[in-house]
A protein has these predicted regions:
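FMN-binding flavodoxin-like domain, especially the glycine-rich phosphate-binding loop
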Residues: 2-4, 12-16, 24-34, 42, ...
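Glycosyltransferase specificity loop/lid
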Residues: 39
Length: 159
């Protein structure tokens, strides 16, 4: 099962975290790829299988520049993403009124399009040295559990 990790960033933090997630998940035996949000469409997300969204919030609650087009496309979309499971890690600063708004938006859009949430959205206030590894571990646990359940079902059908 391939994992698609998309990131929205202005300063490179989300991209760095996306690469860290890919490295950890690959080490655990998962296939994972990292994609800049600027290079992906909602149509492509339909085939993502498992989608991890890592994004910061910029300005007054806006998505980063490289995430603007996908943000708008998801907002306007009526695609059925029910075959996609996802999790969102949002970076922000609690000092701002619209703390982690871009991440909250992506979570809301994906839920509205019937994507299956793996974990509640994580809102990180600059403390991602602690929260991010736990988030990746939780995702790995969910994916391993799902893979095990699929394997058991397939094995029992072979009998």
């Amino acid at each position: 099962m391939e994992i698609t990790i998309i990131y929205g960033t202005e300063t490179g933090n989300s991209e760095s975290l996306a690469q860290d997630a890919r490295a950890k998940l690959t080490k655990l035996g998962h296939q994972a790829k990292v994609v800049d949000m600027e290079g992906i469409t909602v149509e492509q997300l339909k085939n993502a299988g498992t989608l991890l969204v890592i994004t910061s919030t910029w300005g007054d609650g806006e998505p980063p520049t490289n995430a603007e087009a996908l943000h708008q496309e998801l907002k306007d979309s009526s695609e059925d993403l029910s075959e996609v499971s996802y999790a969102v890690f949002a970076l922000g600063d609690e000092f701002y009124e619209n703390f982690c708004q871009a991440g909250k938006d992506f979570d809301s859009f994906l839920e509205r399009l019937k994507a299956q949430r793996l974990l509640p959205v994580v809102l990180s206030n600059g403390d991602h040295d602690d929260t991010f590894p736990k988030w990746v571990d939780a995702i790995a646990g969910k994916l391993s559990c799902c893979f095990f359940q699929i394997s058991v079902i397939l094995s029992s059908k072979e009998r």
